[in-house]
Amino acid sequence: MRPNDRTPAQSRPVTITRQFTAHAEGSVLVEFGETKVLCTASFTEGVPRFLKGKGQGWVTAEYGMLPRSTHSRMDREAARGKQSGRTQEIQRLIGRSLRAAVDMKALGENTIVIDCDVIQADGGTRTAAITGACVALVDALNWARGKGILKNNPLKFLIAAVSVGIYKGEPICDLEYIEDSEAETDMNVVMTETGKMIEIQGTAEGEPFSHEELLSLLELAKHGIREIVDVQKAALS
């Protein structure tokens, strides 16, 4: 039995609120249960030096957690003078995932920077960030098309992500913090709207997991992401 009385395959309620802030070309508040992440997409003309003259764009991401997004206050990373390895890993994951969804040639020599700030954390912050960032990205691309900066839509498909894991011997979908902290296996899965894999991050925190359990977890993720994509589409409609 899960602490929240959800069934093994049941995700938390997902809410996506667009145009959450006034200034960014795309902005979204995404909520996976009690996990809340603000995702903004900033569109700028020009690309990093390593891409100049290549006729293609760039999408990158930054990620951070507010000091009191967790149960006890943590120092801002700026105050510590450097980002943690976890932060660097997560923002690279977000950037990689979003780049998979964009035709960089169609983007032209333009850059989109995604900022994901965790307001409240209850497990699954990186998967919520990817899900919300995708919608913010869509809005930023639509803004650029509306301004005549882009002729064609560079978006190839929507992407979303969810966590899965083995908790008390049972594969489950969309772990909240209490489950994540006690899980024997923890996995984050990023997929396209058609169910193709973009990234799988999986670790046996306790007992090693079997091939059969891996397949079961991926099926749970596919089911969960399908439902999350439906929420994205409803938000964008």
Curated annotation (Swiss-Prot):
One of its GO terms (molecular function) is 3'-5'-RNA exonuclease activity. Keywords: Nucleotidyltransferase, RNA-binding, rRNA processing, Transferase, tRNA processing, tRNA-binding. GO terms for biological process: rRNA catabolic process; rRNA processing; tRNA processing. It is an enzyme of class 2 (transferase). Phosphate binds at R86, G124, T125, R126. It catalyses: tRNA(n+1) + phosphate = tRNA(n) + a ribonucleoside 5'-diphosphate. Its EC number is 2.7.7.56. InterPro entries: ExoRNase_PH_dom1, ExoRNase_PH_dom2, ExoRNase_PH_dom2_sf, PNPase/RNase_PH_dom_sf, Ribosomal_Su5_D2-typ_SF, RNase_PH, RNase_PH_bac-type, RNase_PH_CS. Disulfide bonds: none annotated. Signal peptide: none annotated. Pfam families: RNase_PH (PF01138), RNase_PH_C (PF03725). Belongs to the RNase PH family. Phosphorolytic 3'-5' exoribonuclease that plays an important role in tRNA 3'-end maturation. Removes nucleotide residues following the 3'-CCA terminus of tRNAs; can also add nucleotides to the ends of RNA molecules by using nucleoside diphosphates as substrates, but this may not be physiologically important. Probably plays a role in initiation of 16S rRNA degradation (leading to ribosome degradation) during starvation. Homohexameric ring arranged as a trimer of dimers. This is Ribonuclease PH. The lineage of its organism: Bacteria, Pseudomonadati, Pseudomonadota, Gammaproteobacteria, Alteromonadales. The gene is rph.
